[in-house]
Amino acid sequence: MKTIVLKLGGEIVHSPELDLVARDLRTLVDGWNRVAIVHGGGPQATALQKRLGLETRMVAGRRYTDEATLEVMKYVVAGQLNVDLCARLLANGVMPVGLHGASGHAVQATRRPPRVMQGAGPEPVDLGLVGDVVGFNLPLLGDLFERRYVPVLACLGCDDAGQALNINGDTVASQLAGALRADALVLVTSTPGVLRDVKDPSSRIPRITRAEFERLVADGTISGGMIPKLEESFEVLRGGARSVVILGKLSPGDLVAAVLEPGSAGTVLE
């Protein structure tokens, strides 16, 4: 039995690829593996803000969250996307349970204090109603796993006073993987893994260690936005997860293979 945390971006929830994910999830759950899903919803939140005439304010890649923005995140992430995702999973034979920070305090958070952020100048930045994860209701998740339910967590936390807080989905997934001592954190992305040549899917690198990552950065094989993504992933390993898998452009069975036969699909960081 393995414990897997699966991070899905908001863009995959309404894509045909989700059905591939769902069918593979059913195979994993039927094999008595414990699976939790964390999802975001950035693109949909931005689209709704635009329709409502609200400004989307980004600071160093993070969404500034005022009261109006938090309402949008509740509607979109904890509402529409969580329901739609659970419905698609249910249609594929998976038994999901939709959760957010206020659901049994599943995602416990505190409001993030102002801090200096790379790319945002020398002064501390206040991101508004944005949270830092301080814990999870692990007994609740454990009970769901025992009954073969799949927790589906929206990336909203809640503090002890009942204040909902917006949290980056990758952060929630990474910290959940550490808290569960997950065998794998699987990041579903737009690429089939880390590639030696970004134009050639067959150049996938099956496994990368920290030392190999540093060498590939030095020789220019890994560059651009993939560098911070992999750096963050290696931090997940330090936080308690056993491996991180970067996976995308899925074919049937890829998710099962990536979890049960590490290196056979996507790229495994270890």
Swiss-Prot record:
EC top class named in words: transferase
Protein name: Acetylglutamate kinase
Alphabetized InterPro entries for the sequence: AceGlu_kinase-like_sf, AcgluKinase_fam, ArgB, Asp/Glu/Uridylate_kinase
An example Gene Ontology biological process: arginine biosynthetic process via ornithine
Keyword GTP-binding in record: no
Family: Belongs to the acetylglutamate kinase family. ArgB subfamily.
Gene3D superfamilies: Acetylglutamate kinase-like
PANTHER family given in the database record: N-ACETYLGLUTAMATE SYNTHASE, N-ACETYLGLUTAMATE SYNTHASE, MITOCHONDRIAL
Catalytic activity: N-acetyl-L-glutamate + ATP = N-acetyl-L-glutamyl 5-phosphate + ADP
Entry's EC annotation: 2.7.2.8
Pfam families tied to this protein: AA_kinase (PF00696)
GO molecular function, one term: ATP binding
Pathway the protein contributes to: Amino-acid biosynthesis; L-arginine biosynthesis; N(2)-acetyl-L-ornithine from L-glutamate: step 2/4
Record has Lipid biosynthesis as a keyword: no
Gene Ontology cellular-component annotations: cytoplasm
Keywords: Amino-acid biosynthesis, Arginine biosynthesis, ATP-binding, Cytoplasm, Kinase, Nucleotide-binding, Transferase
Role summary: Catalyzes the ATP-dependent phosphorylation of N-acetyl-L-glutamate.
Residues the record marks as site: Transition state stabilizer: K7, K229
Binding residue positions for substrate: G41, G42, R63, N166
Subcellular location(s) per record: Cytoplasm
Underlying gene: argB
